[in-house]
Amino acid sequence: MTAVKTQHSLAGQVYAVPLIQPDLRREEAIQQVADALQYLQNISGDIFSRISQRVELSRRQLQAIGERVSLAQAKIEKIKGSKKAIKVFSSAKYPAPEHLQEYNSVFTGALDPGLQRRPRYRIQSKHRPLDERALQEKLKYFPVCVSTKSEPEDEAEEGLGGLPSNISSISSLLLFNTTENLYKKYVFLDPLAGAVTKTHTMLGTEEEKLFDAPLSISKREQLEQPAPENYFYVPGLGQVPEIDVPSYLPDLPGVADDLMYSADLGPGIAPSAPGAIPELPAFHTEVAEPFQPEREDGALLAPPPPPPPPPPPPPPAPTAVVSAPQPPMSPDVVTVTGKVAREEDSGSGEAHSASVQGAPKEVVDPSSGRATLLESIRQAGGIGKAKLRSVKERKLEKKKQKEQEQVRATSQGGDLMSDLFNKLVMRRKGISGKGPGTGTSEGPGGAFSRMSDSIPPLPPPQQPAGDEDEDDWES
């Protein structure tokens, strides 16, 4: 007798107990019953042994957890009476292994004992002859439900099918304004070509037409989008009672005395800021204003006058003119010319000393660098108070100088008054920085040197009237 292999009904099922087949001979039925019971006993023993091993493994794991709990409890009891603060550092990651252990089934590695080779038995008895009456008797004990109804043949449907339940009148069965029953035969009428019949197969081959657009497109209606539901867990603090207690209570059981609630307890494990970032001081911006000196009573002082021009260079030597010997000058004329020269020299010296004494320190001693130079320019009033001359004024002045030179050349007759006038003009040119050798080119003398050009020239000398003077010169 060979073992009957049975297919497993469930995926992953290891064991499969064989069933005893009907209509067996007596010896054959007894042999299969004995084999099935022995197979069931082996399976039961294997199952219970595996369950016992898994229970023992779980018991050892539980014992290890209990040892860890007892160790933690002993540490808690040790530090329970301490009054010093204890730092507890928690790991930034969850304390779990990198690779989790996969779950192993209880029946991992189990083998089906039915696949083992068993001894074969030879039975001498023969099978009984087939008896139909005996088979009919078995139907009483083994009911068999067999469907005897024949399946209906597929009939060609030509109409719309069965009548709907909501039809209230016979006119609803007929096509509009016709006598055709569409539920019996589907047709459509054409007033020109007549009635055309469509079968069920023709209806199936027709192309499906698009349905009408929804109201949101046809009527331009906008559907309101429902608000998404939030399933996040947001715990609430609830009502917290207000407790008025002192800030420090000494000698409390289980409370440390050296508690420190600050950010200087040490570097944290997690990469986070130790505390709030301190606020930086605010800087006030000031607008630069020109320097304005003030008096003690708070009134503003006028800016100092611009520095005067440098002292005049020594006048050039007059050109020698060959002429006839002239009579000696009278003492009155000599004294007049001496007084005029001394007054001009003294006036220019006093003006220079006053200008040096009245000038600001930044101009007199420009040793403080660029800031001092800018400050002195601001105090002097800048380019707006320099009184610069335009090109037209220069051209007009040059014309006047040429005319004066022509008049001087014509009036130069060798007398004493014309010579004195020429010397005074040369003196004025020397003061203004325009010597006879400078020519028409004008160097960068500065705006203040041009201010002296605005001094009006002396009037031309007048010829002395009277015959007495002529008589004196002739004598």
UniProtKB/Swiss-Prot annotation:
Which stretches does the entry tag as region Disordered?
296-475
The residue ranges flagged as biased composition, category Gly residues, are 432-446
**Entry's Gene Ontology cellular component terms:** autophagosome; BLOC-1 complex; centrosome; cytosol; early endosome; early endosome membrane; endosome; exocyst
Residue span, WH2 domain: 369-391
Q: Where found, per UniProt?
A: Early endosome membrane; Recycling endosome membrane
Per UniProt, location of the Glycyl lysine isopeptide (Lys-Gly) (interchain with G-Cter in ubiquitin) cross-link in this chain = K219
Q: Which GO terms describe its biological process?
A: Arp2/3 complex-mediated actin nucleation; dendritic cell antigen processing and presentation; early endosome to late endosome transport; endocytic recycling; endosomal transport; endosome organization; endosome to plasma membrane protein transport; exocytosis
Quote the PTM field: Ubiquitinated at Lys-219 via 'Lys-63'-linked ubiquitin chains by the TRIM27:MAGEL2 E3 ubiquitin ligase complex, leading to promote endosomal F-actin assembly.
Start-end of Basic and acidic residues biased regions: 390-406
> InterPro entries, alphabetically?
WASH1, WASH1_WAHD, WH2_dom
May I ask which residue range the UniProt record assigns to the signal sequence?
A: none
- Keyword Ubl conjugation carried by entry: yes
Bias (Acidic residues) occurs at: 466-475
Keywords of this protein's UniProt record, alphabetized? Actin-binding, Endosome, Isopeptide bond, Membrane, Protein transport, Transport, Ubl conjugation
Superkingdom of the source? Eukaryota
What does the comment on domains in this protein's record state?
Answer: The VCA (verprolin, cofilin, acidic) domain promotes actin polymerization by the Arp2/3 complex in vitro.
Task: Please give the function described in this protein's UniProt entry.
Answer: Acts as a component of the WASH core complex that functions as a nucleation-promoting factor (NPF) at the surface of endosomes, where it recruits and activates the Arp2/3 complex to induce actin polymerization, playing a key role in the fission of tubules that serve as transport intermediates during endosome sorting. Regulates the trafficking of endosomal alpha5beta1 integrin to the plasma membrane and involved in invasive cell migration.
Instruction: State the protein's name.
Output: WASH complex subunit 1
- State the species of origin: Rattus norvegicus (Rat)
